[in-house]
Amino acid sequence: MIGSRYVKGGSLDTEWGWERKLLSWWANRVYIWLILRATTHDCTGGFRVWNRYVLEGIDRRRIKSNGYIFQAEMAYVTERLGYSVFEVPIHFAERKRGQSKMSLRIQIEAALRVWQVAWRHHALKPADRQVPVSRQVQQ
């Protein structure tokens, strides 16, 4: 399950400037979609709840990303392996403390890493799921 800012009922804090809103929307709904063809509406949001069997079905050695792109890579791999991604609307509130880590360098790195994710996982299919240890014991 993914908490999404970009499904019906989802929203962003009114304190976000239009530039930040546009960058986030464009990254999720245009750029990532064009490269990965991911059906997930909010690939970069951090509100996630994972089913144990989905996590066990992903070969974690394949996941190379960290930071913002980690969220997109996990959503993409989940979709490529044929698992369902369920999105629920969330309100994304402005932080009360601290500073954003989203520098220009991080934006460029994230944009380039989307291509790496596409290249690394484009051939994944449901048959590539790992057999969960918990299910191996039951058989």
Predicted regions and their residues:
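Terminal low-complexity segments of carbohydrate-biosynthetic enzymes
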Residues: 53-54, 80-82, 112-139
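Hydrophobic aliphatic residue packing
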Residues: 1, 54, 85-90, 114
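Acceptor/aglycone-binding surface of glycosyltransferases and processive sugar-polymer synthases
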Residues: 1-68, 95-108
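Catalytic donor-sugar/metal-binding loop of nucleotide-sugar-dependent glycosyltransferases
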Residues: 38-39, 62-66, 75-93
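Hydrophobic alpha-helical segments
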Residues: 18, 23, 65, 85-87, ...
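Generic recognition of well-ordered alpha-helical segments
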Residues: 29, 77, 110-114
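Short, hydrophobic alpha-helical packing/hinge segments within bilobed ligand-binding/sensory domains
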Residues: 46, 74-75
